[in-house]
């Protein structure tokens, strides 16, 4: 008997020690997160102390440098910005970034999607002379950029796995001998890390003094702490090693302080100037919707939303978890009258390109894609991004949802959340460093019924909070939210897991829900399966339970086990509370209303794009430019040039003015008499030409003076 008592004591001690070890692990993990947060806050304090002025990054000079002052290239930069790129004014930090690059400094740019990162290296490429090398991860992005630059008359080429022999021959000759004009060269990171021939030609270009700038786009791919780490990006440090005096600019939309430090080290740019813009996207409306367990109902809701809010064929993206889901949901949307097609990595490259171009040219309203679609897409007028499934982290969701509204106009970001999606994602990310913690962060974002969605991004990226202005569901929709103590029910859940483990068995979240409902019918009969799963996920996120994973020949399964804080709950030292809300899904009309002239100009840019075949509609006229033309209604090429710049006026000015004049004629009800309309249009065209001639004469006179 005495030995049995001792044995029992030993078992109790083992249980208690295991509990203590679990608590220690949880505390250490919490300590690491606190240290990381402390580091972010210190960096934030330094930035605030600098009154918004960018400062040299750690390792560089601590002196504040004024990149907003006047520089010798200012007038040339303004001329190229407006007359070549058609951009009327700089956005936040663009001018300062360009000035830092022009002085020969290495630069790190953290700028939200739609902030204008591309101009930050494309404009210096035009000003510095020689060749600018741009490393970009995706072929579709490279093709978009090269096409857009070619439409502006800029000599841009790409060297990728799909490049033809003639193109490759031209590029290598231009790099080696400099006989042909090669202003911007786009390559994938694989070309840098794996092609000795390319690096040899690039070295000859450098030795001849013609390599003027190196740009690393989507730079977060360098960091193992980033949400989209790519091994080939690790080898890009060779560029700074081989060409130490060539300025390098690294750009990304998302990077925590940890990621920033990592990529600075990996790219060998310790003395870079760092520009960090706000992560806030005030034009985006964020919302989370409960996802039905019935797939048909989810697609019905998505289709209804698109039909009611975006009936003018405005572009959108629907993200899905798997390739199979992409194909299924694209087909389901088509059956419901939505113009949709799918995009994923298993497709033939030509098919992917075809779908991408149809969507880019507004011939297809919705792309249904996996994460393979979208990084750095060059389409500013995406009006909505819908996540049919959960993203794997806050950073990933910020990046993917941020593909909406890059033109600054109101757009929507909707995430459909269901607890059953969590194990699907966790079994994919558990092997990544902090993969589970990152996933649980976005689960908290989805489960919250009171906290501002936007503030979650501020906290995650270590940025001071800003007003949401009602641009998320939790801030815009009033509802009665209650906190309910579910500790007793949680104890039943944990006890069930404990019993299962004692029998040396495993249980998935779905199995756990069924077992609970069968064993405790009287207590939880009123709870639906979704509500039980919601509680289990809450316990996992709160470290009361945890997920463990087992590989099979065909998949990786997620099982629920006891977490580090389980015994605290069972002993009554921890309470579990959940938010309940009476809020019903309310339809918010957030679509944009375009005037008649704006719609006509939109049709015109699509027509020009289709006729040319090699340019995208927004390259012809941006949505902002259409808005400016519609409000100012120019009647001469001179007035139009002041809105869209010289290059676009020369290319498309006559057709744009004709559309404006036709619209004005209709507005004045001149269409009733065709002769009057023709007379009016003829008179206005003549007046436009005369005013253009006068401007040119005045310009010549000023130059002579």
From Swiss-Prot:
Variant or mutagenesis effect after changing residue 117 to M: Loss of ATPase or helicase activity
Main location group: nucleus
InterPro entries referenced in this protein's UniProt entry, alphabetically: DEAD/DEAH_box_helicase_dom (IPR011545), DNA_helicase_ATP-dep_RecQ (IPR004589), Helicase_ATP-bd (IPR014001), Helicase_C-like (IPR001650), HRDC-like_sf (IPR010997), HRDC_dom (IPR002121), HRDC_dom_sf (IPR044876), P-loop_NTPase (IPR027417)
Coiled coil: 1-30
Names of the cofactor(s): Mg(2+); Mn(2+)
GO MF, one example: 3'-5' DNA helicase activity
Reactions catalysed according to its record: Couples ATP hydrolysis with the unwinding of duplex DNA by translocating in the 3'-5' direction; ATP + H2O = ADP + phosphate + H(+)
Extra information: Baeckstroem et al identified RECQL2 in a Mediator complex pull-down assay and suggested that RECQL2 could be a plant specific component of the Mediator complex. However, no experimental evidence has been brought so far to confirm this hypothesis.
Name this polypeptide is given: ATP-dependent DNA helicase Q-like 2
Species assigned in the record: Arabidopsis thaliana (Mouse-ear cress)
């Amino acid at each position: 008997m005495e030995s049995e008592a001792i044995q029992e004591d030993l078992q109790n001690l083992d249980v208690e020690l295991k509990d203590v070890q679990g608590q220690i692990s949880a505390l250490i993990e919490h300590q690491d997160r606190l240290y990381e947060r402390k580091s972010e806050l210190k960096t934030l304090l330094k930035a605030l102390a600098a009154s918004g002025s960018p400062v040299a990054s750690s390792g560089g000079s601590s002196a504040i440098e004024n990149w907003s002052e006047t520089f010798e290239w200012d007038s040339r930069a303004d001329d190229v910005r407006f007359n070549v790129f058609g951009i009327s004014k700089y956005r936040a930090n663009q001018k300062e970034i360009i000035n830092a690059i022009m002085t020969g400094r290495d630069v790190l740019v953290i700028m939200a999607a739609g902030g204008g990162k591309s101009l930050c290296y494309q404009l210096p490429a035009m000003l510095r002379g020689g060749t600018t090398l741009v490393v970009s991860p995706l072929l579709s992005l490279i093709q978009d950029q090269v096409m857009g630059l070619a439409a502006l008359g800029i000599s841009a080429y790409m060297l990728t796995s799909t490049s033809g022999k003639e193109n490759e021959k031209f590029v290598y000759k231009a790099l080696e001998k400099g006989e042909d004009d090669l202003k911007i060269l786009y390559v994938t990171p694989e070309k840098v890390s794996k092609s000795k021939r390319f690096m040899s030609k690039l070295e000859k270009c450098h030795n001849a003094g013609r390599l003027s700038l190196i740009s690393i786009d989507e730079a977060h791919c360098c960091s193992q702490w980033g949400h989209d780490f790519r091994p080939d990006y690790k080898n890009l440090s060779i560029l700074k090693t081989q060409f130490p005096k060539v300025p390098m600019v690294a750009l990304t939309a998302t990077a925590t302080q940890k990621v920033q430090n990592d990529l600075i080290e990996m790219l060998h740019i310790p003395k870079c100037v760092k520009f960090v813009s706000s992560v806030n996207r005030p034009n985006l409306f964020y919302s989370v919707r409960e996802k039905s367990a019935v797939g048909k109902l989810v697609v019905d809701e998505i289709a209804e939303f698109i039909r009611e809010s975006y009936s003018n064929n405005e572009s959108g993206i629907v993200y899905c978890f798997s390739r199979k889901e992409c194909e299924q949901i694209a087909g389901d949307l088509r059956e419901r009258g939505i113009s949709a097609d799918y995009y994923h990595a298993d497709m033939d490259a030509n098919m992917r390109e075809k779908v991408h171009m149809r969507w880019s040219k507004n011939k297809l309203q919705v792309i249904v894609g996996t994460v393979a679609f979208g990084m750095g897409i060059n389409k500013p007028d995406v009006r909505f991004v819908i996540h049919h499934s959960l993203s794997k982290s806050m950073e990933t969701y910020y990046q993917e949802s941020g593909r909406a509204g890059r033109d600054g106009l109101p757009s929507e970001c909707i995430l459909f959340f269901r607890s059953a999606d969590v194990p699907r994602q966790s079994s994919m990310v558990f092997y990544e460093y902090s993969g589970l913690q990152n996933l649980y962060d976005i689960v908290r974002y989805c489960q919250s019924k009171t906290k501002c969605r936007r503030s979650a991004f501020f906290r995650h990226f270590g940025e001071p909070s800003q007003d949401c202005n009602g641009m998320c569901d939790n801030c815009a929709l009033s509802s009665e939210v209650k906190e309910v103590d579910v500790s007793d029910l949680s104890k039943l859940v944990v006890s069930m897991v404990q019993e299962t483990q004692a029998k040396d068995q495993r249980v998935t979240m779905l199995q756990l829900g069924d077992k609970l409902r069968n064993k405790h019918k009287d207590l939880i009969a009123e709870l639906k399966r979704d509500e039980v799963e919601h509680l289990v996920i809450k316990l996992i996120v709160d470290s009361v339970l945890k997920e463990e994973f087992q590989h099979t020949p065909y998949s990786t399964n997620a099982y629920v086990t006891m977490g580090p804080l389980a015994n605290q709950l069972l002993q009554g030292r921890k309470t579990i509370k959940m938010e309940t809300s009476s809020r019903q899904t309310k339809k918010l009309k957030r679509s944009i209303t375009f005037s008649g002239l704006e719609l006509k100009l939109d049709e015109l840019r699509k027509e020009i794009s289709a006729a040319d075949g090699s340019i995208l509609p927004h390259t012809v006229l941006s949505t902002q430019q259409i808005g400016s033309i519609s409000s100012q209604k120019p009647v001469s090429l001179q007035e139009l040039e002041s809105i869209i710049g010289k290059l676009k006026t020369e290319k498309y000015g006559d057709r744009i003015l004709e559309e404006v004049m036709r619209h004005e004629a209709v507005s004045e009800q001149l269409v009733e008499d065709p002769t009057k309309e023709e007379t009016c249009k003829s008179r206005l065209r003549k007046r436009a030409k005369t005013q253009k001639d006068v401007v040119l004469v005045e310009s010549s006179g000023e130059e002579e003076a």
